[in-house]
Design a protein with these regions (language model features):
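Non-heme di-metal
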Residues: 2-195
Length: 195
């Protein structure tokens, strides 16, 4: 059946529908229930209710402490977040033996939308009828701009010695790069905790 290339609206919804249609309805429902339980479990983790969250939200920390927190987070997550997203996009190939041919494209589209946002793109067209985007508005450079606002130099960043736990978080995420399921699960947890 030939396709008419006319409908480019709602790519996120189309990708989700394509993913849903690529597996039996019972498996989709089972996955939704698993996701609901996982979110509830994450919400119950001590890190989700840690007193530090309230302290951060209420602005009770001094500049030195905030600077250290931002450098820790930079090392643990920020520097490698898009690496993990791109790896997840590549690893969708692991789905193909279990699904119909081409089904890996649906999660790739969803990941692409996230990647575009991370890379500084916005919905819409620019003055030349091309994609709206600017790499300087990518999340990683914006994070580096925040560190600039804290007065940190490039040398400060390069010479920073992260804590053992920040290093372990980074190593754990990087160790997931060979498994689509692992890297996507860790990215989801990271997104959930940041939000």
């Amino acid at each position: 059946m030939s396709k008419k290339f006319e409908d480019f609206n709602n790519p996120r919804e189309k990708a989700l529908q394509g993913m849903k249609d690529s597996i039996p309805a019972s498996q989709w429902e089972e996955n939704l229930q698993f996701l609901k339980k996982l979110r509830n479990k994450i919400a119950q983790l001590p890190v989700s209710k840690h007193p530090a969250i309230e302290i951060l939200n209420n602005g009770y920390l001094d500049k030195q402490t905030l600077t250290r927190i931002h450098l820790e987070y930079r090392h643990a997550i920020v520097q490698i977040f898009t690496d993990a997203l791109l790896k997840a996009q590549f690893l969708t190939k692991q789905l193909e033996p279990k699904l119909h041919s081409g089904a890996k494209m649906f999660p790739r589209v969803l990941l692409s939308l996230n990647i575009l946002d991370e890379f500084g793109f916005r919905p819409g067209l620019d003055k030349d009828n091309y994609y709206l985007g600017n790499p300087e508005y990518a999340h990683y450079p914006l994070y580096e701009d925040l560190l600039n606002d804290y007065g940190l130099t490039e040398a400060d960043r390069r010479n920073y010695k992260p804590s053992k736990i920040a290093d372990q978080v980074r190593t754990f995420l990087e160790a997931s790069y060979d498994s689509y399921i692992n890297v996507v699960a860790l990215l989801a947890v990271a997104e959930e905790e940041v939000i």
